[in-house]
């Protein structure tokens, strides 16, 4: 008996109705999910096969999860790949995941606590280890941050060690007045928290859930903020200044493609906190550079996805310059204190004579200080 005739067959399998157009190709749900999985599979191949690393012993990777779509989808995909590998009679050495959840309500006051989300994560992905922390736990995991706060902050801010860690961090963040500086500082704090935790549990690297769209926006924002040198580790796969490998397995997927994948799996809907739609009434001057670049990439990416993808591809070709071991690092962000001529620079050389004595801040961190406005 002949099969049912399809009105819009999938171009890959031709056995099911196509439901989505993926880069000019009509695919069914299964083929679409396979397309997304393969993009991530290629990026994790080195860890799966343990290329250029020991094939014995654990290979632990840390996955920071924000309950956002991208990091949740990355966990879902990597979990499926790990389970598939373990089911083989002769599996590859592979890797193991530890998931770090930074409670979103401690990062943004507009984000509600998501206790049920953490419980659902553990129930949905029982084969992995999970840890939940607050942003102010950076004091506990990275004690050196305490010395940096007074150096970085404005003259009117005094760090009170007798206060609770939460109150100390809230007071420090409240002293930062511009939107761009607040976002910049929060990103640095989150990175330092993630790095400190990864080192504590002896991870080899960190896998970030940044899509191509996010990486393109980050590239443009970093250049605008004077952090162009950080692109080699904030956008590119490879070694970071912290002695950990940074990887971005979703770098070949647009944000819309990641969102489509998430819609296929009901278990993710209860975990993911949806993004707030951008407000049309907010003034541009009240947006951070990061928010402006994300809006730009998202709107232009809908019209010209190939052009936006080229931003990330071009950035991924950048190579970090060889920095001598004795070159000082920025005490806040960890970047090297070298200018384009290879000369050591200090924060004061960036044009701000009010940097406190003893502070070793790079040019970009000097610009983010409360006394300096973008």
UniProtKB/Swiss-Prot annotation:
Pathway: tRNA modification; 5-methoxycarbonylmethyl-2-thiouridine-tRNA biosynthesis
Keywords: Cytoplasm, tRNA processing
Organism expressing this protein natively: Aspergillus clavatus (strain ATCC 1007 / CBS 513.65 / DSM 816 / NCTC 3887 / NRRL 1 / QM 1276 / 107)
GO molecular function, one term: tRNA binding
Subcellular location: Cytoplasm
One GO cellular component, as annotated: cytosol
Gene: ncs2
Record-level GO BP terms: protein urmylation; tRNA thio-modification; tRNA wobble position uridine thiolation; tRNA wobble uridine modification
Pfam families named in the record: CTU2
Primary subcellular site in the record, as a coarse category: cytoplasm
Sequence similarity: Belongs to the CTU2/NCS2 family.
Protein name, UniProt field: Cytoplasmic tRNA 2-thiolation protein 2
Function per UniProt: Plays a central role in 2-thiolation of mcm(5)S(2)U at tRNA wobble positions of tRNA(Lys), tRNA(Glu) and tRNA(Gln). May act by forming a heterodimer with ncs6 that ligates sulfur from thiocarboxylated urm1 onto the uridine of tRNAs at wobble position. Prior mcm(5) tRNA modification by the elongator complex is required for 2-thiolation. May also be involved in protein urmylation.
InterPro entries named among the record's database cross-references: CTU2, Rossmann-like_a/b/a_fold
């Amino acid at each position: 008996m002949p099969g049912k005739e399809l009105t819009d067959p999938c171009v890959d399998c031709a056995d099911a109705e196509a439901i989505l157009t993926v880069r000019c190709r009509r695919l069914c749900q299964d083929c679409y999910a396979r397309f997304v999985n393969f993009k991530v599979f290629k990026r994790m191949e080195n860890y799966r096969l343990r290329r250029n690393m020991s094939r014995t012993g654990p290979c632990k990777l840390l996955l920071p999860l924000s309950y956002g779509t991208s990091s949740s989808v990355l966990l879902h995909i990597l979990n499926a790949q790990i389970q598939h590998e373990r089911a083989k009679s002769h599996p590859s050495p592979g890797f193991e995941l530890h998931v770090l959840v930074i409670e979103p309500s401690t990062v943004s006051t507009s984000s509600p606590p998501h206790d049920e989300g953490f419980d659902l994560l553990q129930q949905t992905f029982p084969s992995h280890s999970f840890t939940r922390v607050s942003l102010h736990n950076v004091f506990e995991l990275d004690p050196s941050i305490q010395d940096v706060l007074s150096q970085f902050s404005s003259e009117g801010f005094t760090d009170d060690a007798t206060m609770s860690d939460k109150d100390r961090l809230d007071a420090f963040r409240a002293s930062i007045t511009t939107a761009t500086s607040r976002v910049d500082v929060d990103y640095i704090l989150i990175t330092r928290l993630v790095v400190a935790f990864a080192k504590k549990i002896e991870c080899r690297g960190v896998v970030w859930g940044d899509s191509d769209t996010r990486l393109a926006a980050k590239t443009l924002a970093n250049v605008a903020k004077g952090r162009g040198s950080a692109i080699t580790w904030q956008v590119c796969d490879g070694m970071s200044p912290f002695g950990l490998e940074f990887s971005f397995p979703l770098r070949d997927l647009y944000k819309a493609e990641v969102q489509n994948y998430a819609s296929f799996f009901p278990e993710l809907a209860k975990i993911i906190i949806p993004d707030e739609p951008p407000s049309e009434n907010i003034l541009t001057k009240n947006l951070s550079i990061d928010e402006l670049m994300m809006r730009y990439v998202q709107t232009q990416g809908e019209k010209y996805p190939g052009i936006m993808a080229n931003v990330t591809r071009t950035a991924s070709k950048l190579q970090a310059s060889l920095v001598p071991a004795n070159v000082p690092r920025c005490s806040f962000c960890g970047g090297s204190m070298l200018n384009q001529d290879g000369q050591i620079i200090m924060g004061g050389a960036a044009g701000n004579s009010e940097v406190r004595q003893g502070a070793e801040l790079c040019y970009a961190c000097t610009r983010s200080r409360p006394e300096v406005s973008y």
